[in-house]
UniProtKB/Swiss-Prot annotation:
Limits of the GIY-YIG domain: 13-99
Keyword field contains Cytoplasm: yes
Encoding gene per record: uvrC
Organism, as annotated: Helicobacter pylori (strain G27)
Primary location group: cytoplasm
Subunit structure: Interacts with UvrB in an incision complex.
Keywords associated with the record: Cytoplasm, DNA damage, DNA excision, DNA repair, Excision nuclease, SOS response
Name of the featured protein: UvrABC system protein C
GO biological processes: nucleotide-excision repair; SOS response
HAMAP family listed in its UniProt record: UvrC
Amino acid sequence: MADLLSSLKNLPNSSGVYQYFDKNRQLLYIGKAKNLKKRIKSYFSICNNEITPNHRASLRIQMMVKQIAFLETILVENEQDALILENSLIKQLKPKYNILLRDDKTYPYIYMDFSTDFPIPLITRKILKQPGVKYFGPFTSGAKDILDSLYELLPLVQKKNCIKDKKACMFYQIERCKAPCEDKITKEEYLKIAKECLEMIENKDRLIKELELKMERLSSNLRFEEALIYRDRIAKIQKIAPFTCMDLAKLYDLDIFAFYGASNKAVLVKMFMRGGKIISSAFEKIHSLNGFDTDEAMKQAIINHYQSHLPLIPEQILLNACSNEALKELQEFISHQYSKKIALSIPKKGDKLALIEIAMKNAQEIFSQEKTSNEDLILEEVRSLFNLECVPYRVEIFDTSHHANSQCVGGMVVYENNEFQKDSYRRYHLKGSNEYAQMSELLTRRALDFAKEPPPNLWVIDGGRAQLNIALEILKSSGSFVEVIAISKEKRDSKAYRSKGGAKDIIHTPSDTFKLLPSDKRLQWVQKLRDESHRYAINFHRSTKLKNMKQIALLKEKGIGEASVKKLLDYFGSFEAIEKASEQEKNAVLKKRI
C-alpha cells in the first residue's frame, strides 16, 4: 500500500486517463478525468496513512477499491482526448471492472449519386462528401436484401462500371436493364426509374407490396423455388424496422439509446428515426461479473457509434438515463467530432419520452427472453471447475495446421451466445518452423488486433501446457485480461471416436490439469469448441495446399521445375509475389544460390 499512498500524494491536476491494478498487477479499471487529482482521490478515504474506500461510492466501486494496490496515469491535452483514449484502452485491455460493449461497427447506408447521368443504389459505410448524393439509413440489417430487390424489380443499370463498356450485356437481354450504354434510353427516361427507386427505399411498404406481387406471379407459374426466395427476402425486409407503424407528425431525425440491466446481464437497444419513422433498430446483450454502471455503458455506446464520421447525423440523441456530468461530456464529444451542436437529452414528456419508453420496453422484453439455458449452466460449471474469474460468454479458440512445416496456417473460431459466430472467424498464413512457433505467431497477431477487435473472456488453445504457457506470456505482454485453457488431444485421435464422447482428452489451466470422464458435459463443451477450430484450420490448410498445387502446375507449364519453384518461394515469399515479379527478377533469383 506504500506505493499506492505515494501515488495518491503526487497526483497531477491535469486531464488524463487513470488505471487501477491489484497486487498481482492485474488491471482492474480504466477511467478518465478532467482533473486526475480530484477524480482519483474521490475513490478513497485516507486517515493516518490508512487507505479505505470512500463510503459514498457504490458497493461495486468499494469492492474494487479494496483490491487496488497500484495506479498509473496517462496525461493528455484535454478532456476530449481523455474520453477517446479511455474508450480505446477499455476495448483493448478489457479491465475486470469496466463494461465492454463490443458492437462498435459502422452500420451501412444505401445511397444514390444523382450527380451521375445514370444513378444506381449502392451500399456504403463511408462518406462521399459531394453534392447530389442522397443517403438512406443506417440499416442495422437487411440493406443488401433491399438492394437486391431494387435491382430485380426495376430496370436499373446493374453494375457501377456498365456504362463505360458501351455495349449491352445479358441484363438487357433478360429485360433487367434498359442499356443506356448503347443509348437505348435517354437520361430523362432513366431518371424516372431512379426516382421510382428512391420512393421504394423511402417507403418499404411499397417495396414489400411489389415483392409480394412478384412472388405470387412466380408461384402461379409453378416456379416455387424462386417464389420461396422472395418470401424469405420479404420476411427479412419486414424485420428491418419492426416499429415502422410509429409515424410521428413531426419529421424528427433521432437516434435513441436505451439501457436496461439487472444482476450480471444487460441489454442496450438502439433505434434510428429518420423523417418521423423508425427505419432500423439493433440491440446488444452485455454480461458483467461485477454489475453495471449506466454512465459507463452510455459513454461507450455513444463513442463507439459516433467516433467514425457518419453521413447522416440526427438532430438529437435521446438516452433513457445518464448523469448530468456524463451527458455534458458526451455533448462536448459529439459537438467536437462533427463541428456542430447535436443535442443529447433524457426526455421527460411528450413524443420523445414515448420513444424512449418503447425502446426501454423492447430492452426489457429482450432481457426477459434471456432465460437460463442448459448451456448457461454448463458455462457456470466450466467457470467453477477451471477456477475462471469470468463466465466465458465469449470464447476464441485457436488451432494451427501444416504439412511437414509447409503451407502453415492458423485459424481462430469464436463462440458467443451459445453458438459459433462465423462472421468473426479469422484465418492466418503462418511462417513458424514448428508448431510452437506457429502458435506463438498466431496468438501474437490476434493480440495485436485487440484495439480493433476487443479480447474475449476466454482463449481455448488446441495444444498442451507448452502452448498454454505461450498464450499466457503473450497476454501478459499485451496487458489485456484474458483467461486461458488448453486441451491436448489424446494419441488415439479418431474423429468418430471423439464425436461419440469417447475421447479422454486432457485440459490444462495455469494452475492445474484435468482428466475428466468422457461423459462429462464440461469436457464435451471444450471438445466441441476444439473440434470446430480443428475443422476450420484443416479446411483452410487444404484449400491453401490445393491453391499452391495449382500455382506449381502453372509454373511447371512455363518450364519452371519444383526445385526452382522452391527457390522462388524462398526469395519472394508467396505465389502472388512471384506472379508480380518481372521475368528479369525471376531469372536473377534462379541463377543465384538462396
